Amino acid sequence: RVTDSAASGTALSSGQKTYNGAIGVDIDTLNVKTMLEWAEEKNMATGLVATSTVTHATPASFAAHVDYRKKEWQIAEQFAETEIDVILGGGKTFWPDELIKEYENRGGQFIESIDAQLNPEKRILGLFAEGALPTVNEGRTPTTTQMADMALNKLEQNPNGFFVMIEESQVDWGGHAN
């Protein structure tokens, strides 16, 4: 049996094998500690960058705990309650206005443009498309490099170091299309 992005993302982020579709849980649906959560315990800065929705299987596997990968609304709710310093990618459709307000009330800054003026004292949630970002051939803005630069510039300010997961999600999708 071939693994999927949720199970492989969970294995990559935690060292724990699990079933296809699982995000941050083991085969008994018990939460597993991820590298991102470990980094936060060490007072390191943390970030997630993806060209898919930020709540998609691979990025979600580093910070969420749900029994099935398609629960992107629930994953967004969990993200809003975390202390992740930078979350950049697509998926605004899974972040209703009330959830974005909750995120902002918890000390976050919501942006929809890579050129937004950032508040250095706030965590960043950048959602640049309703769903996944457009492909490069479709004129993707922002680019993976632009998002990575924004994340790294923010995260490197932490004297304890940082952990960031950067996924060029659409490489995976290209593989599925072949």
Residue ranges and their predicted role:
Residues 36-40, 48, 151-154, 169, ...:
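Short secondary-structure boundary segments
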Residues 68, 140-148:
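Phosphate/oxyanion-binding active-site loops and adjacent basic polyanion-contact surfaces
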Residues 90-92, 129-131, 168:
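Short, structured patches in soluble enzyme cores that scaffold and shape functional sites
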Residues 83-84, 120-135, 139:
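Formylglycine-dependent
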Residues 103, 111-127, 147-169:
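Active-site regions of oxyanion-processing enzymes, predominantly non-cytosolic
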Residues 57-62, 132-139, 157-178:
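Active-site His/acidic residue clusters
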Residues 1-94, 99-117, 122:
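N-terminal catalytic scaffold of extracellular/periplasmic and nuclease hydrolases
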Residues 29-33, 145-152:
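Short, hydrophobic/amphipathic alpha-helical packing segments
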